[in-house]
Structures are given as structure tokens and as C-alpha cells.
Design a protein with these regions (language model features):
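Short acidic, S/G/P-rich loop/turn micro-motifs used as interaction or catalytic elements
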Residues: 231-232, 338-343, 363-367, 422
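Hard-cation-handling environments
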Residues: 233-354, 358, 382-384, 401, ...
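Histidine/acidic-residue-rich catalytic or RNA/ligand-binding cores of hydrolases
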Residues: 297, 370-376, 399-403
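His/Asp/Glu-rich metal-coordinating catalytic cores
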Residues: 2-77, 86-267, 271-278, 282-286, ...
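Mobile, glycine- and charge-enriched loop segments
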Residues: 352-358, 366-395
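Internal alpha/beta domain cores that form substrate/cofactor-binding pockets in large enzymes
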Residues: 365-368, 388-425
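Short, charged/polar "capping" segments at the starts of alpha-helices
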Residues: 50, 108-111, 267, 290-295, ...
Length: 425
């Protein structure tokens, strides 16, 4: 397995920046920033299906082992921009003596995910030696996540607290992405200033803080490391508020509405909620992760957001007594792609002409043959409904947004990662 690697030395300093993975692929990014005594890795992600050559668990272990065997420093750590698998997916392979850092919201989402996986494994697997190994592995992952060092998001117009890894200073800055609690980093070492954007956008509800943050804090930047996910895609990046407006229009035209969306995207769930309220529809959800995520969002963000991120959807499960009321009054049901069988059962007896699926996810999941081969769930969900409308916007920066970020920051050097091979700024 070959892997494109890029390295640059910052002038008049001991700072070395190594892109172990991500210079020619979306996801699976691993960036190393080192000095004579210290090094910090930004993200240790799992490769995304369909975006590069798949790796086996053995190859992942060898990759992590080889990276940590080289350039060993007295002070080492991994910091995560957010909790998507293509950024945190190799966390369980990081050596135990290397501390890992993430925002508290990201930690809570990871704990929710792996706790639910453990519950599913307990219920689905018959007692056996193999089941015991799986549950032990689940427990080890949960313990490792609990051991993460965490930071809290600061209030608006307040400088975030920095932390030190040896002689490297890291300051996390909250941003908008398609998952809750996503961050950029200002990384300072040996007189040099590096701005790592992680994944970001300016068209979400939380995206309004992007440019003011850059104007205020991203000055005298020697190196800007930015994502470039959309550079070859040409994604149409409408505002999240426009997503909600379009949803409200079609929700008003159908009695029964299913919304296929990510459980961890706080801004998309807010769009669904706002649209359903405008359309005067009852709000429901199914799926354990959806419920846990909304409780995290409500607990942490309801008051700060003045109610925008206050979620009180009603839960719907198997043989639920709510079915009768829902069929009578109509509904909006938010769900994930793994719950198709339940949703089909719930829609039995309903007139298909009154049922609409709002597909609110990346269209590549059902259009790209490689994506469909890896996971056909999104395509299958879409094909199960005669009435379907796509209403979505990217969780990533548009080409115009990336250009504006570069223009504001005015870095001495730019490295673009998290992009397809051949994509150019």
C-alpha cells in the first residue's frame, strides 16, 4: 500500500510539517507538526469508503505503528478537529502513552456511538468467545474515549484557552461543519504560526463567526492548512436557512414526511425542526443515536442558541402507540439510513401519494458506484419511496469560501488537504 506524503520545513525555525495522509484524498487525514522536542498530530482518520484504496485493520495498525516509530519526541499528542470517522477513526490504535484531545461535544458524541454499538453487539451476538472479544474491544474503546483530554467551547467574542504540548501551543476555535463541535486550530511553535482549518464552511447557522474569527486571530500566519473537499465537485453551497425554507415548502404539500439526515449534524436538525414548525407538522425521530445526539445538543446548546438547538422530537419505536395519532394528523419523521425496515413498516397502509422522502445527505452516497458498493443503504432508502426530493447543502467550504479564507489570512504558504487527487486551489 502506497501513501502520498508531503513535508515542508518552515523557514528560520525548527518546525517541520508532515502530511502523512490527505494531500491527495478526502478523509483519512493525518498531519504532523514537530519541533526538536515536541510533536502534535492533527487528526488520525480512517479512510473514507470510495475515496481511496480501502485499508485493512492490519494495514491501519501498521500505519499507526510506523508513524509513531519515526521522529519520536519527548512530548507528543493527537488533537482532533471533530468526531467524524475520517478524522478520529484510528483513535483506538494510538499508543496509550500519547494523550488525545478533542472538544467535549465531540467526546460525548463518540461515547454515545460506541455505547450504542456495545449494546447492539450484546443483543445481536450469541454468547461465544468471539462475542466476548468484541465486547472487550468495545469496552476498551469507550475507556480510551473517556481518557481524552477535552476543552469547552468558549462564549462568543472570547478568546479560547490554549494548551501546551511541550513547546507547541494549540488554541482551538469553534467553526461550522456537518457535525457538532468542530474546530480550527492556531498552532504556535518556535516563533511560527500555523492555522489548521479542519473541515469548515461559511453557510451554516454557526458559519457567521468564521470570518470575524479569522480577522481577529489569524494574523501573521506562516502556514495555512486548509481543506479542499469541494474543489473538484462543484457543490452548490446554499445557506442552511435556505435548506430549511425549501423543506418547509415541500412539508406543507405532503401529509407524511420522512427526512433522511445525519444524527450528529446539529445545524441540519435545526433546519428540519424549523421547517416542520412552519409547516405545522408533528416532529418525530427514530434511532438511538438520533435521540442521544439531540439530548447532547439540547443540554449544551439550547440556551446559548436561544432555542435554535433545543430539540424535543417525539421518539417512535416498534409497535408504538403513537402510530394511530401520526397516521391521523400527519408527521415529520427524522431518521438515519439504517432504519429503512422500520420506516417501511411504519408507512404500511399510508397512501404513497401522501408520503414524501426528503433526502438530506450528500448525493454521492447513492450516485457514486463505489459509494453504493461500499454501503447501499442510502440508495436503497431512496429507492423505497416514489416521491423523493433532495434538499441538502455541503458541510464543507465552497471554492469561494476557501478563497476568501486565504485572502483574509494572507499566509506566507498554503497547503491544501482533504481534497481529491488533482484538485487545485
Amino acid at each position: 500500500m502506497t501513501m502520498a506524503r508531503f513535508q515542508t520545513y518552515l523557514k528560520d525555525s525548527d518546525v517541520v510539517v508532515t502530511i502523512h495522509r490527505g494531500i491527495d484524498q478526502i478523509g483519512g487525514c493525518i498531519t504532523e507538526i514537530s519541533t526538536k522536542t515536541s510533536r502534535v498530530f492533527v487528526d488520525f482518520g480512517q479512510n473514507l469508503p470510495g475515496c481511496t484504496v480501502p485499508t485493512t485493520p492490519e494495514q491501519d495498525k501498521a500505519l499507526v505503528r510506523d508513524i509513531f516509530a519515526q521522529n519520536v519526541k519527548q512530548h507528543q499528542a493527537v488533537v482532533y478537529t471533530h468526531a467524524h470517522e475520517d478524522h478520529v477513526g484510528l483513535f483506538d490504535l494510538i499508543p496509550c502513552d500519547v494523550p488525545q484531545y478533542i472538544g467535549v461535544g465531540g467526546q460525548e458524541l463518540m461515547l454515545a456511538k460506541y455505547d450504542l454499538l456495545k449494546i447492539a453487539h450484546e443483543q445481536e451476538w450469541k454468547d461465544s468467545e468471539e462475542k466476548s472479544k468484541i465486547l472487550i474491544d468495545d469496552e476498551q474503546k469507550i475507556r480510551k474515549i473517556k481518557d481524552f483530554h477535552i476543552w469547552e467551547r468558549t462564549a462568543p467574542h472570547t478568546r479560547p484557552k490554549s494548551f501546551m504540548i511541550g513547546d507547541i501551543r494549540i488554541t482551538p476555535f469553534f467553526n461550522s461543519h456537518s457535525i457538532y463541535d468542530s474546530y480550527m486550530f492556531l498552532i504556535e511553535a518556535d516563533g511560527k504560526r500555523i492555522w489548521h482549518t479542519g473541515d469548515y464552511r461559511d453557510h451554516g447557522y454557526l458559519g457567521k463567526g468564521l470570518y470575524p474569527t479569522l480577522h481577529r486571530y489569524a494574523s501573521n500566519i506562516d502556514l495555512l492548512i486548509t481543506e479542499g473537499t469541494t474543489l473538484k465537485r462543484g457543490d452548490l453551497c446554499i445557506q442552511e436557512s435556505e435548506v430549511s425554507r425549501r423543506m418547509a415548502c415541500v412539508m406543507s404539500a405532503f401529509k407524511y414526511v420522512i427526512v433522511l439526515a445525519s444524527a450528529t449534524d446539529i445545524e441540519r436538525l435545526a433546519s428540519v425542526k424549523t421547517a416542520a414548525l412552519k409547516a405545522r407538522k408533528g416532529l418525530y425521530y427514530t434511532g438511538g443515536m438520533m435521540g442521544r445526539a439531540m439530548r447532547i445538543f439540547t443540554h449544551r446548546e439550547a440556551k446559548k442558541s436561544k432555542g435554535l438547538f433545543d430539540f424535543h422530537f417525539k421518539y417512535v419505536g416498534e409497535d408504538d402507540s403513537k402510530f394511530g395519532e401520526m397516521q391521523k394528523k400527519g408527521f415529520v419523521l427524522v431518521t438515519g439510513a439504517s432504519h429503512l425496515d422500520f420506516v417501511k413498516k411504519m408507512c404500511q397502509g399510508l397512501s404513497s401519494s401522501e408520503v414524501l422522502l426528503i433526502y438530506s445527505a450528500w448525493d454521492g452516497y447513492y450516485k457514486d458506484p463505489l459509494q453504493v458498493k461500499q454501503n447501499p443503504a442510502y440508495r436503497d432508502f431512496r429507492e423505497a419511496f416514489p416521491n423523493v426530493v433532495d434538499i441538502h447543502t455541503s458541510g464543507h467550504a465552497s471554492r469561494e469560501c476557501i478563497k476568501k479564507v486565504i485572502d483574509i489570512v494572507k499566509p506566507k504558504e498554503v497547503i491544501c488537504i482533504h481534497k481529491e487527487a488533482g484538485a487545485e486551489l
